[in-house]
């Protein structure tokens, strides 16, 4: 279930800090920087931060922004704190379905090799979206190149 992230603010910070210097952080940031969300007590217009919870247990984090003038959702962030938990994917795709059905455009990025790629591909295909691949545009800590992938779904 998605709930306002401010309710789990400290716990989300600690979970992100546990992931510093990991491949998961590369998937979140798209670069080698370490990062954690700055969750505001009162979010700005168009900014959404959610804790993904099962029962009362924090299992993930989802964020995005909406430009209401352009009717577009973008700048998504997703982190699963409990790898393999199907509730994370279920809640995220439910929110994506809501956004796709109400907005003109939904776009998000992903680093190649992310385990969510297959699910993103299927979702994008189901909504007649596009997948753009920028070959070898990201370099990881081991020196290996990865693709930068952009998904877009545009409603008429």
Could you say what each language-model-derived stretch is?
Residues 126-146:
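Conserved catalytic-core motifs of GNAT/GCN5-like acyltransferases
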Residues 28-73, 79-85:
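Acetyl-CoA-dependent GNAT
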Residues 47, 146-150:
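Short hydrophobic/aromatic beta-strand or adjacent loop that forms the aromatic wall/cage
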Residues 84-101, 117-122:
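Conserved acetyl-CoA-binding loop-helix of GNAT-fold acetyltransferases
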Residues 1-41:
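A short, well-structured alpha-helix characteristic of acyl/acetyltransferase catalytic modules
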Residues 107-125, 138:
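Conserved beta-strand-loop-alpha-helix junction that forms the acyl-donor binding cleft
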Residues 72-74, 147-148:
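Residues on conserved beta-strands of the protein kinase catalytic domain
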């Amino acid at each position: 279930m998605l709930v306002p992230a401010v309710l789990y603010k400290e716990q989300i910070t600690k979970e992100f800090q546990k992931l510093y210097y990991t491949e998961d952080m590369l998937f979140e940031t798209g670069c080698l920087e370490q990062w954690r969300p700055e969750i505001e007590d009162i979010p700005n217009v168009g900014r959404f931060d959610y804790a993904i919870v099962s029962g009362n247990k924090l299992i993930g984090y989802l964020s995005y922004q909406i430009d209401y003038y352009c009717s577009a959702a973008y700048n998504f962030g997703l982190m699963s704190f409990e790898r393999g938990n199907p509730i994370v994917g279920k809640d995220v795709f439910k929110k994506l379905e809501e956004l796709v059905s109400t907005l003109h455009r939904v776009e998000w990025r992903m680093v190649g090799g992310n385990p969510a790629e297959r699910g993103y591909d299927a979702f994008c295909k189901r909504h007649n979206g596009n997948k753009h691949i920028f070959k070898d545009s990201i370099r990881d800590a081991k020196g290996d190149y990865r693709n930068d992938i952009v998904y877009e779904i545009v409603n008429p």
